[in-house]
Amino acid sequence: MSEITHEIDANFAGRLNILRAGVLGANDGIISIAGVVIGVASATNNIWIIFLSGLAAILAGAFSMAGGEYVSVSTQKDTEEAAVAREQLLLDKDMDAAKKSLYAAYLQNGECETSAQLLTNKAFLKNPLKALVEEKYGIEYEEFTNPWHAAASSFIAFVLGSLPPMLSIIIFPSEYRIPATVFIVAISLLVTGYTSAKLGKAPTKTAMIRNLCIGLLTMGVTYLFGQLFSI
């Protein structure tokens, strides 16, 4: 029963991490695109220039996020697969050394000598490779993250996050364009700050204020920069 509970907790934690990464990706989309469209709108009232600038920023940001996530997850997957291959080789060449290695890992992870010995014996009766990679490296055996899935998730999250600033800067009339966008972006940042804090079990108020301040600072700087080149 405890092993089943452990697997359920691990799967749940994995899903939470994916969801939290999605929220943070959306947050990047909000702040990045808000900064671009506010800066451009500060420099010109031409809606096509604003739209094309925002669209280019969305595409560049989304592909950059997706590419970075793909490289990161691919590297992690390669490392994990190498660890599995290394432990499989150890099992094939020297079973006693593999047992001692797992026993030492249990001790290092806080088990007493008796418990570590019992767990080691039990693991070698069931799935020693699974126990070795999970205890020694903290890897979820045969649960490698697909880099293409991770890249697609980052791409979608960034695009979804970019929608509030992009749509508001286009929809509202020119005289209300910037203040309305700032307001909508501020609300969006409060929501993502609250959500990410909840998922990470961190203080929500601090996260919301921090997120809002970063967004307002970004928009403020790009607005002033746009004023310097107003056309």
Predicted ranges, named:
Residues 1-72:
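Internal alpha-helical transmembrane segments
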Residues 2-14, 73-155:
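Cytosol/matrix-facing amphipathic helices and coiled-coil assembly/linker segments
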Residues 10-26, 88, 142-145, 199-209:
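Interhelical loop and helix-boundary elements at the membrane-water interface
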Residues 19, 167, 171-231:
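Alpha-helical transmembrane anchor segments
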Residues 20-24, 49-57, 61, 123, ...:
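Alpha-helical transmembrane segments of multi-pass membrane proteins, especially transporters
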Residues 28, 67, 106, 116, ...:
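Residue-level signature of catalytic and energy-coupling elements of molecular machines
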Residues 29-34, 154-165:
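Core segments of transmembrane alpha-helices
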Residues 62, 66-74, 78, 83, ...:
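Membrane-spanning helices that line or support transport/gating and their immediate boundary helices
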